[in-house]
Amino acid sequence: MRKYYPIIVALDFPEEKRALEIAEKLVPYIKNFKVGLELFSVAGPHIVKALKEMGTNVFIDLKLFDIPNTVVRTLDRLLALEPFMVTLHILGGEEMLRESVKLVSQYKESNKTEYPYLLGVTVLTSFNEETLRRSWGISRSLPEQVLFLAQLAQETGLDGVIASPWEIELLRNNLKRPMLIVTPGIRLTKEKTDDQQRIMTPREALERGSDYLVIGRPITQSPDPYEVIQNIRSQIEDIVESRL
């Protein structure tokens, strides 16, 4: 059983060496790390294995989105890496979701484990309502679209969803059953400084009901990542203790 701690450090780097250097510095304090599309495309399964050798929990965030057969076969290969979490796009549709859930459920049963958590991506945190309409042609408001997709994720059996901090309360108040909510778009201040549109501080996101916080650049691009981690821990420690 993994001890719960809500911070996941996103290793969003274009090279394996830099990612592992950061992980080595932080692993005494943080055990959860995210490997996204950029890093995985460079380092492949080796980066996941290297991180796991450090004793970490690895979130493989590839946001799978393809025909059901392709997604299931890809998931099957990712499961061999024993990830902590895996993502796919809810927009991939009901059949893709159900087939993915079936495979992951069989894996969990066979291996007597509750991991990986299978998570569905709702609406990317770089999107706003104008982007939603112009890029996807969807007339729902952004919160309505997030809720619609989260409900589909729940109906098809996913463990949780990826959603911005702005939609946490909406999901907590409207989903029929509790689901994991994993939250990107976490920044140490409310000031917008990059491509993330819907952001929030770590404490605010946890107070609203997020289970896990994905934090990348504020930690990994800091001159002193350890200091940033300690600052975040001091802000949220009482909330974490109440959940243990």
Swiss-Prot record:
SMART domains: OMPdecase. Its EC number is 4.1.1.23. Pathway: Pyrimidine metabolism; UMP biosynthesis via de novo pathway; UMP from orotate: step 2/2. GO terms for molecular function: orotidine-5'-phosphate decarboxylase activity. It is an enzyme of class 4 (lyase). Keywords: Decarboxylase, Lyase, Pyrimidine biosynthesis. CDD domains: OMP_decarboxylase_like. GO terms for biological process: 'de novo' pyrimidine nucleobase biosynthetic process; 'de novo' UMP biosynthetic process. PROSITE patterns: OMPDECASE. The active site is at K63 (proton donor). It comes from the Bacteria. One of its GO terms (cellular component) is cytosol. Belongs to the OMP decarboxylase family. Type 1 subfamily. Catalyzes the decarboxylation of orotidine 5'-monophosphate (OMP) to uridine 5'-monophosphate (UMP). Homodimer. This is Orotidine 5'-phosphate decarboxylase. The gene is pyrF.
